Amino acid sequence: MFKKCILILAASCMMYSCATQTESNPFLTEFQTPNGVPPFDKIKLEHYEPAFQKGIEEQNANIQAIIDNTEAPTFENVIVALDNSSPTLDRVGGVFFNLTEAETTDELTALSMKLAPTLAEHEDNISLNQELFKKVDAVYSQKDALGLTREQQRLLEKTHKKFIRSGANLPADKQARLREINKQLSTLGITFSNNILNENNDFKLYVGKEEDLAGLPQWFRESAMAEARATGQEGKWLFTLHNASRLPFLQYSANRPLREQMYKAYINRGNNNDKNDNKKIIADIVRLRLEKAQLLGFDCYSNFVLDNTMAKNSTAVMDFLNNLWSYALPKAKAEAAELQKLMDKEGKGEKLEAWDWWYYTEKLRKEKYNLEEEEIKPYFKLENVREGAFAVANKLYGITLTKLEGIPVYHPDVEVFEVKAADGSQVGIFYVDYFPRPGKSGGAWMSNYREQQGSIRPLVCNVCSFTKPVGDTPSLLTIDEVETLFHEFGHALHGLLTQCQYKGTSCLLYTSDAAD
């Protein structure tokens, strides 16, 4: 009787523990938030790993159910079931992998390194599962007789090809080697990216003399002074490798040695023979990618990647680039000669170098067209440009974007908009994250926190690296940055306006060279 009571008590404790974990870990159930947005205010570092583990267990069980199904394989009970097999992984992965790019920390990076081999193994366990592939192949073999819609045909084709490209047809010994390669590549890629991010963050060009700021616009000086003040360097100016700092510095700084220092620091990221050096990592990645491609029947990795794109092979790509090169190279040489003439007028006997290009291009624009980019920027206040992009979307598609307050975000810079169609129905939720910071990768991109699927509306984000407002000076965009905002918003519209029945055919799941 005593033992029975102990067992009952233990079982009760286990049930309570599981219930408590489910209640406290927001990833383990559908998000209980307006519009199902991620509850960033409740998500903690310790939630990710158990959620990934639970997601793996859940998908394994769902896949086993597909395999154990005694009915004849069909599009619904195999392809659709597989497409819907990972709700928890989709939830936690949608947040985790976005934040490792937009708001990472040392702890998040370490966790990413820890999880990468496990997730790579899980992916291989699915792709190399022979019983599952037999069912996928059985459906694929009768594709022409199934009366599928174009979208269903696309999902079936993508699913089957993914298994083939992942090694489902390889013999056991080659599959084992492929697993090891994928495991190594999963961590090498993270290390490479993290080293670049570290190099971006580690480089700090402090300027202590005002004469060394010659040529720099006043707004840029104020921004650099605010950056220095934030690091405890009062009375100095701080310039970094983030686009919003590096590019204006190269464009306006009259101090050639400092331009050279800035340019070389950027170009040599991962090439400084220090803890962030990427040379061996690059060599390992190239070697493993080549071996992987050859295992899968391709002569090189580029042909393996391009086989899944519109271009199809590296020959087509090189033909395109070589044709472009025949026109671009003479033009570039003519522009370089023009810039060199401008340098020669200064009588310093200097030869045009890469770190001179932006600076003398700006001077040439002034001399040739009486136009300076600084004269244009006041017309491109960030908020005005964004509203312009929203207005274009309204004119083209009838949608409206309204700012939402009180929605959880992962950083104070992030803003959230609700997107509605002309009839008032919801199109999706749109996040914007426009300014650089130490935990954020450089560049600009669009991504999803949730894919559109049937009646499920997408959660889409744009992440950029525009100049932050300083004091009373708003964020003013260059022409290139205006183009970037519209470009990334175009990708966001693709994600928001997607109307697909299946997750596997939704916005981000098209060929990479069709994207831009």
Residue ranges and their predicted role:
Residues 32-47, 96-115, 139-180, 240-280, ...:
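Short His/Asp/Glu-rich catalytic/ion-coordination signatures at enzyme active sites or charged loops
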Residues 155, 187, 194, 199-240, ...:
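Active-site-proximal, well-structured secondary-structure segments within enzyme catalytic domains
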Residues 16-17:
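C-terminal motif of bacterial Sec signal peptides marking the signal peptidase cleavage site
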Residues 21-47, 54, 261, 367, ...:
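C-terminal, non-catalytic "cap/extension" segments appended to globular domains
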Residues 480-495:
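Active-site recognition of the HExxH zinc-binding catalytic motif
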Residues 510-515:
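Conserved small/polar residues in nucleotide/adenosyl-binding loops
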Residues 22-216:
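N-terminal helix-rich structural modules
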Residues 5-13:
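Sec-dependent N-terminal signal peptides
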